[in-house]
Regions:
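C-terminal motif of bacterial Sec signal peptides marking the signal peptidase cleavage site
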Residues: 9-12
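Beta-rich carbohydrate-recognition and catalytic domains
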Residues: 14-184, 188-236, 245-295, 308-309
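Calcium-binding acidic motifs and repeat modules
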Residues: 5
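Glycine-rich, aromatic-lined ligand/substrate-binding cores of catalytic
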Residues: 300, 309-310
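Carbohydrate-binding surfaces of carbohydrate-active enzymes
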Residues: 304-306
Length: 310
């Protein structure tokens, strides 16, 4: 099975925090109309100076991690960390954009907003084709971290192709008492006939693997903890467990975003190669850390769901 395409992080410009000597976005003389300066003000044109043309950007406000990326009936649905109220971090919700070619994107209404359990942190979305959760066949189920003083895992479901969501009345589906368990990435594991969730353990530098028959009731199966000799402390976020075919065998790759202490400066994306039996991920004995990208700010990239063998 070929792995789905990996989407790069869509965080805002952070290079100035790392590369303070020179930044062309700041030092280059302005020759065109600049972007709006007031927080939350919408651009009059998508062609203003410095507007990215390849990477998706919303018309206004704060954006970071891609979330819930799923392919449905010819349309790619990109959800993302979004602040509907301003240009700074906070009020985190799931923004939403759609595309048929992953080049031309149409911004949609905000899909999920903070509720009594907290802000809506990163997560994933699946198509429940066999109605395992009881929300209806082909319901789109979003799985995300409810973030307040504690980070717990919650779900919401959609009956209109991912346009609007209803939060599950039984949330949170995974309870937790601290702020170091987040970013659920979920896929269907055919061999065990269960949904598999990988969860980042933050500053514990590892991940947890959970399983469920129905997306509502979850069992913790194992932990994968790594202590890389000679590496300073860093947090783990946005894990993704991906199968690949290699020399006629299936191998599994775990990618995880770490911050700080990337390969150069700032953040980075590590990967581990190994095997997964439905409960445990076991890494091969390789010279870790291995890096997906050697730039200064590669972060929060994860794979698309429901793309078949692509």
């Amino acid at each position: 099975m070929a792995a789905a395409a990996i989407a790069a992080t869509i965080t805002g410009c952070t290079d100035y925090d790392i590369q303070q000597d020179y930044n062309p976005l700041i030092d280059k003389p302005q020759t065109e109309e600049p972007a709006p300066e007031q927080p939350g003000e919408e651009a009059n044109s998508r062609n203003e100076q410095y507007r990215p043309q390849i990477h998706y950007t919303p018309a206004k406000n704060w954006i970071n991690d891609p979330n819930g990326m799923i392919y449905l009936d010819g349309t790619y649905h990109l959800y993302y960390q979004y602040n509907p109220q301003g240009n700074g971090w906070g009020n985190l919700s799931w923004g939403h954009a759609t595309s048929t070619d992953m080049l031309h994107w149409e911004e949609q209404p905000v899909a999920l907003q903070p509720d009594a359990l907290g802000m809506i942190f990163s997560g994933s979305a699946v198509c429940d084709k066999d109605n395992t959760a009881g929300f209806g066949a082909n319901a789109i189920v979003a799985l995300y971290t409810s973030a307040s003083a504690a980070q717990q895992q919650s779900i919401a479901y959609s009956h209109d192709g991912g346009k609007t969501f209803t939060t599950y009345e039984g949330n949170p589906v995974i309870k937790n008492n601290d702020d170091n368990l987040r970013d659920p990435k979920v896929f269907w594991h055919e061999e065990s006939k269960k949904w598999i969730m990988s969860l980042a353990k933050g500053w514990a530098r590892g991940m947890e693997i959970w399983s469920s028959p129905d997306l509502k009731n979850w069992t913790k199966e194992s932990e994968f903890i790594v202590n890389l000799t000679g590496r300073p402390s860093f947090q783990w976020e946005c894990p993704d467990l991906i199968p690949f075919e290699y020399n006629g065998k299936r191998k599994w790759v775990l990618i995880v975003s770490v911050n700080p202490c990337g390969p150069v400066l700032g953040s980075g994306t590590m990967y581990f190669v190994g095997d997964f039996d439905g409960k445990h991920f076991t890494a091969d004995d390789l010279d870790y850390p291995l890096w997906l990208d050697y730039g200064m700010d590669n972060y929060a990239g994860v794979t698309w769901n429901n793309t078949g063998d692509r």
